[in-house]
């Protein structure tokens, strides 16, 4: 099933495995309210094909536990572990004027807040465990780089204008950035003060 570029799919959760012996499915949700995933009912795979239909859901300390037609055993639920769950962008409620979805940041132009220098475009939003970061593709080529998605580094987001104003931390190697502190050639990691 083709995914429409006008209505892209948005990742809202991931199957964590089975729960109990009756085929209930544990889902880690990426929604503000974990139970809101049950409101979508039919969840899709990344290619747009059907993934799961939620008949009922309840919140647990680790996410949401759902009953899904066609998943009747713990083994069947465990076999779904890792399955990413998507919904069309149009299924999400519209954010308030001063709010946005992280997916709305992809493709926005990034400019330096003080110099107006073009820094690049947002390629993706990542989270490796320490908070959201923006992967930036420089417009003039070169390797992508990461920008912490914090108020200090990203003081302004103007989704309607397609713009992010950023104040990136100094990069290692910049003359104004932090000094690089390497090891002496005879020093071992454990010997540093």
Curated annotation (Swiss-Prot):
HAMAP family per record: Ribosome_mat_RimM
Localization terms from the record: Cytoplasm
Species this chain originates from: Caulobacter vibrioides (strain ATCC 19089 / CIP 103742 / CB 15)
InterPro entries: PRC-brl_dom, PRC_barrel-like_sf, RimM, RimM_N, RimM_N_sf, Transl_B-barrel_sf
Entry's free-text remark on domains: The PRC barrel domain binds ribosomal protein uS19.
Stretches with biased composition (Basic and acidic residues): 173-193
Known partners and oligomeric status: Binds ribosomal protein uS19.
Family per record: Belongs to the RimM family.
NCBIfam families, alphabetized: 16S_RimM
Keyword terms: Chaperone, Cytoplasm, Ribosome biogenesis, rRNA processing
Molecular-function GO terms, alphabetical: ribosome binding
Positions of transmembrane segments: none
GO biological process: ribosomal small subunit biogenesis; rRNA processing
Pfam families reported in the protein's UniProt record: PRC, RimM
Protein name from the UniProt record: Ribosome maturation factor RimM
